[in-house]
Amino acid sequence: MLVMAVAFAVALLAQPATPAQAKVATTQDSSFSFYFSGAGTTQGTSWRSKDTYSSTYINVTSMRGNAPRMYVDGSSYSSGYGEHNCTNGGYVRVPGLGKYEIHNSVRESGYRFARLTGWADNGWGSISGVWSPDCAGNYADLN
C-alpha cells in the first residue's frame, strides 16, 4: 500500500504544469498618459511585475508634438529602487499611432519589475495609450 502511495505521489509530481499552475505573464493593459512641457522633462508609469523574457507591449492611441524617447526600466523592487534602463539599444522612438513591442532585458538582467518611461529631448509633446510589461502577441518592433 505504501509503495502504491509513493508511486502515485511521484506520478503526480512528474506531470507537466497545467495552465492554471503555470506562471501567467503580465499582459493586462494599463493606461499611460505622458505630457512633456519641454526638453528635459520626463514621465513614467507605475512599476509592474514582469513575469517573462518577452518584449514589453505598447499601444499608442494619441500623440502630439515631438515624439519622446521611450524606455523600459527594470528594478528588483516594486518601489523602483535601483532602477536601470533595460531598453535594447538604449531607447526607442514611437513613429506614430499603433501597437508595438519594445525589446528589453529586464528579466535577463535579473529584475522582476518594469515600468515605461518617456523623456522629451526635442521639446514639448504628449503620448498616451496602454502598455503591459509582457507581450502576448507579435507587433511591430521598435528596436
Predicted regions and their residues:
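Beta-sandwich interaction modules
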Residues: Q43-S49, G89-G110
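Edge beta-strands of jelly-roll/beta-sandwich modules across compartments, strongly enriched
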Residues: P68-M70, R112, G123-D141
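Beta-strand-rich extracellular modules
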Residues: W119-D121
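Extended extracellular/luminal ectodomain segments enriched in beta-structured repeat modules
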Residues: S49-Y57
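Acidic, Ser/Thr
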Residues: T61-M63
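Short, surface-exposed beta-strand/strand-loop-strand elements in extracellular ectodomains
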Residues: G65-E83
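Short Trp-Ser/Thr-centered turn/loop motifs at beta-strand boundaries
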Residues: D29, G40-K50, G89, S128-G137
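N-terminal prepro-regions of secreted/extracellular proteins
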Residues: M1-S49
